[in-house]
Amino acid sequence: MVDMKIWTGRVDAAEGEAAKRWHQAVQAMPENGAPGIAIIGFACDEGVRRNQGRVGAAGGPKTLRKALANLAYHPTLPLYDAGDVACADGDLAAAQQRLGERVAQVIAAGHLPLVLGGGHETAYGHWLGLSAAHPDKRIGVINFDAHFDLRQASEATSGTPFAQIAADCARHGRVFRYLCLGVAETANTQALFDTARRLGAEWRLDTDMNGWQLADIRGQLAEFLDSVDAVYLTIDLDVLPAAQMPAVSAPAGYGVDIAVVEALAGRIAKSGKLAGADLVEFNPDYDIDSHGAKAAARLAWSLSRHLRR
């Protein structure tokens, strides 16, 4: 059951049908609907807890829906709410499996999944759904993140999802294609850089993600897009500077400006290869006057503006 009561906001009825906002456009997921964007919440921060982070991201989906609700709606694709997948019992693996099943279901119905996390453990569940829905496609993972999230650990955490994806690729004979944009040398040990090299990952440091470097970044991005059939885009909001995104477990001391992230994410959305996207690590407990919620909602809104199905 989808709780649609959360989708409320300003109504500009005097300005006519073209004055809609998201809360007036989002529908509960229908059994049969025109291809659109399916919003899925992953109300989970069990991975963050296991990774010794600051919990609270389980409240992200609800807060981000509220932030999206009042944004102006410019018609591109239908918007659907496919409800939440929660992890209330600490069983992260089961929650990730349920998320994967939900993602696969919305893809089978012709929609593009937009997942609102939740910690970055969201990524492995999202991957399970994408890989099941596209078994024969070369799926590339593009991660905007200050961290590689390639940790080796005895149990899954918010720091292990891409190591898990690499292992899943190995089990199923897939090539692990991973591009991480915004990596902070201060936040990743040499061991993590060594792991990234061993797995054949590509990356770009946060210090090489400035606006004046966009031409070079776009070139690297274009090469990666050319090498894959489909893209899984994941935006860890801690890639943004702390001044723009305070509402995360690990705020960035440097970070990548939101204008750069938006421009590059928009290019990915317009490529025609986007198979699924998520925004993760938003923690409303640490937000300041909704600054973080508004920044995250802006990125989700921007993706929707660039998509065509």
UniProtKB/Swiss-Prot annotation:
Keywords from the UniProt entry: Histidine metabolism, Hydrolase, Manganese, Metal-binding
Gene3D superfamilies registered for this protein in UniProt: Ureohydrolase domain (3.40.800.10)
Xref: Pfam families: Arginase
CDD domains to which the protein is assigned, alphabetical: Formimidoylglutamase (cd09988)
Required cofactor names: Mn(2+)
Residue pairs linked by disulfide bridges in the UniProt entry: none
Catalyzed chemical reaction(s): N-formimidoyl-L-glutamate + H2O = formamide + L-glutamate
Annotated function: Catalyzes the conversion of N-formimidoyl-L-glutamate to L-glutamate and formamide.
Name the record gives this protein: Formimidoylglutamase
Organism: Chromobacterium violaceum (strain ATCC 12472 / DSM 30191 / JCM 1249 / CCUG 213 / NBRC 12614 / NCIMB 9131 / NCTC 9757 / MK)
EC numbers on record: 3.5.3.8
GO process terms (BP): L-histidine catabolic process to glutamate and formamide; L-histidine catabolic process to glutamate and formate; putrescine biosynthetic process from arginine, via agmatine
Cofactor note: Binds 2 manganese ions per subunit.
One GO MF term attached to the UniProt entry: agmatinase activity
